[in-house]
Amino acid sequence: MVDDSAVVRQVLVNVLNDAADIEVIATAADPLLAIEKMRKQWPDVIVLDVEMPRMDGITFLRKIMSERPTPVVICSTLTEKGARVTMDALAAGAVAVVTKPRLGLKQFLTESADELVATVRSAARANVKRLAARVTAVPLEAEVKHTADVILPAQSGRALAQTTERIVAIGTSTGGTQALEEVLTALPRVCPGIVIVQHMPEKFTAAFAARLNGLCQIAVKEAANNDRVMPGRALIAPGGKHLLLRRSGAQYFVEVLEGPPVNRHRPSVDVLFRSAARAAGSNALGIIMTGMGDDGAAGLLEMRQAGARTVAQDEQTSIVFGMPKEAIKRGGADRILPLGAMAREIVTQLQ
């Protein structure tokens, strides 16, 4: 646990040590002290602040990933600057991000403690060798588990193909920021409209979208209500809100809305995929990529049953082979592809 705030360290340590399967073996106020302690006992997961004295978290992260790749969870503040730095950390190899406790510690313990524990568990299962290789190649959840029914009730029958416009729906979680960067930067300007759910806290998705927009040939933005899904543009669900695909005549739009977490996530991949099955049917391509848990597995099956093409990322290239594995197990994927083949699969959706 590396954070320059003693209060934050204590809160996070207490939360993690309360979990039966997690033990915090050391804490440090800065990366240099952390390195000394880690040499005595190397951790399975590092929880890291990004703004600290003596050595910033990004420099420390790059050092770790180059010398001894280890899953790193970024603990960052909900500020614009914090979001930008967090995006740099994810690009440098961090597997996930959680929000730092604020003054309302009681609210944090109520709303975010379970998310912190689940994120650390997920990080411990991450394929760090794959993550470290990707970093080198690319320069610089709620107690009640709701289903998508609480946002969009299920319905029988296939969507009517009232348009020939193709769309792509992508869902991902742990390791997804790096995976999405690899896929989206490989796309040409001429490609189908894309809608994306990446599990990420609110206020971080805008910075993530802005970063990708600067790297990609296609346009990338955080989705706003009633944004049109257009060829050559990707819309990323805002953190803390669900994203649905809607059709009006021959055009597709997105709806951004509040609602309870689904599969302990908001945004939820299942919600997006169900809406894509209903609105686009056989005009859609559904892709589920790296991530822990089962969010998106049921929705991908619904997309396939509605006539869509569906793809799951393979185990070898996934940072965490959880969501794709569950989708494959349930019969939702008609193809299993490595990450490097996803961009080509998206382009063929135009044909």
Curated annotation (Swiss-Prot):
Subcellular location: Cytoplasm
Sequence positions bearing 4-aspartylphosphate: D49
Domain Response regulatory stretches: 1-115
Listed Pfam families: CheB_methylest, Response_reg
PTM comment, free text: Phosphorylated by CheA. Phosphorylation of the N-terminal regulatory domain activates the methylesterase activity.
Principal place of residence: cytoplasm
GO cellular component: cytoplasm
E.C. numbers: 3.1.1.61, 3.5.1.44
Catalysis performed (reactions): [protein]-L-glutamate 5-O-methyl ester + H2O = L-glutamyl-[protein] + methanol + H(+); L-glutaminyl-[protein] + H2O = L-glutamyl-[protein] + NH4(+)
InterPro entries tied to this protein: CheB-like, CheB_C, CheY-like_superfamily, Sig_transdc_resp-reg_Me-estase, Sig_transdc_resp-reg_receiver
Alphabetical keyword list: Chemotaxis, Cytoplasm, Hydrolase, Phosphoprotein
Domain CheB-type methylesterase, chain residue ranges per copy: 161-351
SUPFAM superfamilies the record matches: CheY-like, Methylesterase CheB, C-terminal domain
Gene Ontology MF term list: phosphorelay response regulator activity; protein-glutamate methylesterase activity; protein-glutamine glutaminase activity
Active site (record annotation): S173, H199, D295
GO biological-process terms attached to the record: chemotaxis
Family: Belongs to the CheB family.
Known function: Involved in chemotaxis. Part of a chemotaxis signal transduction system that modulates chemotaxis in response to various stimuli. Catalyzes the demethylation of specific methylglutamate residues introduced into the chemoreceptors (methyl-accepting chemotaxis proteins or MCP) by CheR. Also mediates the irreversible deamidation of specific glutamine residues to glutamic acid.
Domains: entry comment: Contains a C-terminal catalytic domain, and an N-terminal region which modulates catalytic activity.
Protein name: Protein-glutamate methylesterase/protein-glutamine glutaminase 1
Lineage: Bacteria, Pseudomonadati, Pseudomonadota, Gammaproteobacteria, Lysobacterales
